[in-house]
Amino acid sequence: MRTHYSSDVNEKLQNQKVTICGWVHRRRDHGGVIFLDIRDRTGLVQLVFNPESKAFKVADSLRGEYVIKATGTVNLRPEGQENKNLASGKVEIIGEDLEIVNKSKTIPFQLDDFQSTGEDVKLKYRYIDLRRPEMQNKLITRSKAIRYVRNFLDNNGFLDIETPFLTKATPEGARDYLVPSRNFNGKFYALPQSPQLFKQLLMVSGFDRYYQVVKCFRDEDLRADRQPEFTQIDIEASFIDEAFIMSTMEKMIAGLFDATIGVKFDTPFQVMTYAEAMDKYGSDKPDLRIPLEFVNIKEDMKNEEFKVFSGPANDPEARVVAMRVPGGNDKLSRKKIDEYTKFVGIYGARGLAYIKINSLSEGKEGLQSPIVKNISEETLFKVIEKTGAQVGDVLFFGAAKAKIVNDSMGALRAKIGEDFEIFTKDWAPLWVVDFPMFEKDDNRLYAVHHPFTAPKVDTVEELTKDPENLLSRAYDMVINGYEVGGGSIRIHRQDMQAKVFNLLGISDEEAREKFGFMLDALSYGTPIHGGIAFGVDRLIMLLTNTTNIRDVIAFPKTQTASCLMTEAPSNVSLEQLNELGIAVKKEDK
């Protein structure tokens, strides 16, 4: 039907006849001449119909979002009427033939007025919202990114192999989405939370290098950066170590950013241990663009009478830290500090102590804060020296159980960085390594990553000696405070895998029921292997500079995991339920 896309129409086509197809983005009538901006996924082009044109009457009947096909001759625009914002902005098409392919009702919101439109309306009419150029550009970037990744992995010897969607429910952390079986009454498939076990089985099978761009499903409470169904770049390789995965993947990600948005990363990426990340930033995914760090002052506060600090300072499970904000006196009003005090309360902090440094030569008199009178001058200036604070700076303090300090001060660090844009660079990729193998909660061990992650020990005896302090062979890639990928070297021996299940409170019987096929496979000559998975949606959020994951998915769910457009999930017929042997329990009113 068409000869050219809108953005292809330029001065090189002057005096040539072209045919375009698209939507009427805007219609204007100037002195009897009709000007149309025609939109397709590449952009806009101006179409002009003079009164003497045989298609003028049809052009006069057009309204917004009508779908048209038009043929005309490309002319240079009159001098002074060029539009530098358009690829086609130096030319216009003098219309000769015009066909209305389809009319449109008045759309529920104007594409140029999307910011004042509620998200529920935009999600209900998603096919309208996706006509916006900024939305289309995000999905075009997504397509380019996935194509780049596929090409990179193909060129590096990885095989694209599909794994099942209908599989077995296994305890991987979040709840599974279950699919009832019609053939096996009372039994259920589960949609995979990841292809983890299947990709490891492919390594047992000898495929050596695997990848897949795959949908995964998790029935969990949603956040701004979570969806019930999401896309992973899933990767696994055999006869490798951490260095291979990390060097190969950072080349892929560096190339991806360069190819899609022209951003060049220095390689190799910075590597930081989990312990260092938590110690300095209170987060295992620190945003290293922000030049704010924690300074540990626990020892300095142990003998102070100020119980707010000395209490946690003498608690082995607590932390006391200071964080310097350079030039904070000018930035941080009392109102702003009160706002931050409420903010850290979200993370369990009971308050937010601070000191403003007005002078370093007047003792306590040069320090402004309600807490100054409660702490000795010697300790105060020791803390100032430790943090490197100068006149005009502000110190914030965290003193509580380690998790509360890490969560609250880590979030405060990120918020201050964002609020005042105190970034030292645009991009900060890094690897975080040496994660704990397990974490303890309610007197029980849980896997920090997943139960197939290899520990940094080689024998069952070492594994059971001190499991709470074991490190794992896991690694996460972090960019600007987002964990974009996570992986590990896997357990490749049956005895080690069985013992990890035991340490996690999974009995031999339960392990056999849930993972018997995997344990069997590990006894048939399994190579050393490992891999990683990247969240496509989060990567595209970074590449398109958006904070809402729904903006980078064509048809996303709401935060209640529903689709306003299709009205899913929905009721099904009693006949369907009976076929599946399912009875729906009515909610108590």
Curated annotation (Swiss-Prot):
<feature type="site" description="Important for tRNA non-discrimination">
    <location>
        <position position="80"/>
    </location>
</feature>
<dbReference type="InterPro" id="IPR002312">
    <property type="entry name" value="Asp/Asn-tRNA-synth_IIb"/>
</dbReference>
<feature type="binding site">
    <location>
        <position position="490"/>
    </location>
    <ligand>
        <name>L-aspartate</name>
    </ligand>
</feature>
<keyword id="KW-0067">ATP-binding</keyword>
<dbReference type="GO" id="GO:0004815">
    <property type="term" value="F:aspartate-tRNA ligase activity"/>
</dbReference>
<dbReference type="InterPro" id="IPR045864">
    <property type="entry name" value="aa-tRNA-synth_II/BPL/LPL"/>
</dbReference>
<dbReference type="InterPro" id="IPR006195">
    <property type="entry name" value="aa-tRNA-synth_II"/>
</dbReference>
<dbReference type="InterPro" id="IPR004364">
    <property type="entry name" value="Aa-tRNA-synt_II"/>
</dbReference>
<dbReference type="GO" id="GO:0006422">
    <property type="term" value="P:aspartyl-tRNA aminoacylation"/>
</dbReference>
<dbReference type="Pfam" id="PF02938">
    <property type="entry name" value="GAD"/>
</dbReference>
<dbReference type="InterPro" id="IPR029351">
    <property type="entry name" value="GAD_dom"/>
</dbReference>
<keyword id="KW-0436">Ligase</keyword>
<dbReference type="GO" id="GO:0005737">
    <property type="term" value="C:cytoplasm"/>
</dbReference>
<comment type="subunit">
    <text>Homodimer.</text>
</comment>
<feature type="site" description="Important for tRNA non-discrimination">
    <location>
        <position position="30"/>
    </location>
</feature>
<feature type="binding site">
    <location>
        <begin position="218"/>
        <end position="220"/>
    </location>
    <ligand>
        <name>ATP</name>
    </ligand>
</feature>
<feature type="binding site">
    <location>
        <begin position="535"/>
        <end position="538"/>
    </location>
    <ligand>
        <name>ATP</name>
    </ligand>
</feature>
<feature type="binding site">
    <location>
        <position position="227"/>
    </location>
    <ligand>
        <name>ATP</name>
    </ligand>
</feature>
<feature type="binding site">
    <location>
        <position position="218"/>
    </location>
    <ligand>
        <name>L-aspartate</name>
    </ligand>
</feature>
<feature type="binding site">
    <location>
        <position position="172"/>
    </location>
    <ligand>
        <name>L-aspartate</name>
    </ligand>
</feature>
<keyword id="KW-0963">Cytoplasm</keyword>
<comment type="similarity">
    <text>Belongs to the class-II aminoacyl-tRNA synthetase family. Type 1 subfamily.</text>
</comment>
<comment type="function">
    <text>Aspartyl-tRNA synthetase with relaxed tRNA specificity since it is able to aspartylate not only its cognate tRNA(Asp) but also tRNA(Asn). Reaction proceeds in two steps: L-aspartate is first activated by ATP to form Asp-AMP and then transferred to the acceptor end of tRNA(Asp/Asn).</text>
</comment>
<dbReference type="InterPro" id="IPR047089">
    <property type="entry name" value="Asp-tRNA-ligase_1_N"/>
</dbReference>
<dbReference type="InterPro" id="IPR047090">
    <property type="entry name" value="AspRS_core"/>
</dbReference>
<dbReference type="GO" id="GO:0005524">
    <property type="term" value="F:ATP binding"/>
</dbReference>
<dbReference type="InterPro" id="IPR004524">
    <property type="entry name" value="Asp-tRNA-ligase_1"/>
</dbReference>
<keyword id="KW-0648">Protein biosynthesis</keyword>
<dbReference type="InterPro" id="IPR012340">
    <property type="entry name" value="NA-bd_OB-fold"/>
</dbReference>
<feature type="binding site">
    <location>
        <position position="483"/>
    </location>
    <ligand>
        <name>ATP</name>
    </ligand>
</feature>
<dbReference type="InterPro" id="IPR004115">
    <property type="entry name" value="GAD-like_sf"/>
</dbReference>
<keyword id="KW-0030">Aminoacyl-tRNA synthetase</keyword>
<keyword id="KW-0547">Nucleotide-binding</keyword>
<dbReference type="Pfam" id="PF00152">
    <property type="entry name" value="tRNA-synt_2"/>
</dbReference>
<feature type="region of interest" description="Aspartate">
    <location>
        <begin position="196"/>
        <end position="199"/>
    </location>
</feature>
<dbReference type="GO" id="GO:0050560">
    <property type="term" value="F:aspartate-tRNA(Asn) ligase activity"/>
</dbReference>
<dbReference type="InterPro" id="IPR004365">
    <property type="entry name" value="NA-bd_OB_tRNA"/>
</dbReference>
<dbReference type="Pfam" id="PF01336">
    <property type="entry name" value="tRNA_anti-codon"/>
</dbReference>
<protein>
    <recommendedName>
        <fullName>Aspartate--tRNA(Asp/Asn) ligase</fullName>
        <ecNumber>6.1.1.23</ecNumber>
    </recommendedName>
</protein>
<dbReference type="GO" id="GO:0003676">
    <property type="term" value="F:nucleic acid binding"/>
</dbReference>
<feature type="binding site">
    <location>
        <position position="449"/>
    </location>
    <ligand>
        <name>L-aspartate</name>
    </ligand>
</feature>
